[in-house]
């Protein structure tokens, strides 16, 4: 049995993570202005919680980081909609405006005593270990570990959302992109990183490795769901095959009462929308659906093998 994925936004988890009314109020405002960003924040919070579990973080840190993941983009409520929701690439000027969501979110949190403990999440989640991030160009250990976790979760969900994945097939391609961000930029290898024998990319490689585990969990969860659906399809196929056998017996009988007996049995087994005329097509569609789903499962297991071989 596979455990269900953590649903951060459920009332049970909101209670267990002690999100007080002021935080929910701020998030409701964010959702009203930009549902897309709110959903992204929910996904990041979910990932942060699960990453912390794999990183064996203390519960208090996990709670803090999970809430921080939810609040990391709260500054976007101040970004003009025409920039925030622009479908194409931002201009340099628009990008500079977009970057201010970090400082705006920080100011919002610092202005409210209940949000203040989470103020560094909006501020630091775009900082990079190699110093190329914003807004302050922090490096290495100057970036809070919690913000490093949020950055990995944020980048992963941003790529997955942009590509509109409906399955984890080919999800390893997303992880390969993140691996590039965990590796040092070749342009900097001749500089101070090489001199100190320290090589940093933009994101934390250890956190990324644990993201691999989270993704594998999600793949197994998807496989479990597909297998449940296949079992349902098999039950339907079994029922329709029984109908098919009754139909053959009716066709082979010369007795009208016997024919009607089997036809009545067929009608009793029909579900809504099924008839004597269309059930063979329905049966064929179910059989094809099983083959298709089994193929997806094979692809998903292949993804797991690929992910397990990934190196940072």
For the regions a language model picked out, list residue spans one by one:
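Histidine- and acidic-residue-rich, metal-dependent catalytic cores
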Residues: 2-311
């Amino acid at each position: 049995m596979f455990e269900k994925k953590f649903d951060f936004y459920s009332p049970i988890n909101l209670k267990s993570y002690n999100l007080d009314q002021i935080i929910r109020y701020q998030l409701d405002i964010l959702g009203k202005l930009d549902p897309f960003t709110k959903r992204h924040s929910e996904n990041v919070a979910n990932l942060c919680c699960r990453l912390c579990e794999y990183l064996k973080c203390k519960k208090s840190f996990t709670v803090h980081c999970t809430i921080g993941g939810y609040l990391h983009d709260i500054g976007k409520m101040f970004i003009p909609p025409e920039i925030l929701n622009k479908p194409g690439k931002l201009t340099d000027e628009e990008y500079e405006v977009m970057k201010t969501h970090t400082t705006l979110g920080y100011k919002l949190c610092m202005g409210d005593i209940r949000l203040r403990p989470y103020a560094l999440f909006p501020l630091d989640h775009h900082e990079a270990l190699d110093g190329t991030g914003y807004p302050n160009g922090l490096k290495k250990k100057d970036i809070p570990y919690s913000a490093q976790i949020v950055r990995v979760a944020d980048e992963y969900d941003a790529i997955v959302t942009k590509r509109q994945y409906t399955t984890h097939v080919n999800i390893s391609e997303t992880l390969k992109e993140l691996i590039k961000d965990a590796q040092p930029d070749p342009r900097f290898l001749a500089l101070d990183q090489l001199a100190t024998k320290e090589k940093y990319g933009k994101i934390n490689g250890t956190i990324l490795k644990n993201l691999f585990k989270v993704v594998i969990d999600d793949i197994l969860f998807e496989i479990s769901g597909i297998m449940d659906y296949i079992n349902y399809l098999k039950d339907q196929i079994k029922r329709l095959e029984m109908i098919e056998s009754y139909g053959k017996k009716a066709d082979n009988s010369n007795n009208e009462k016997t024919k009607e007996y089997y036809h009545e049995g067929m009608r009793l087994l029909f579900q809504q929308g099924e008839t004597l005329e269309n059930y063979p097509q329905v049966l064929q569609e179910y059989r094809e659906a099983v083959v298709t789903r089994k193929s997806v499962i094979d692809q998903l297991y292949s993804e797991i093998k690929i992910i397990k071989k990934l190196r940072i």
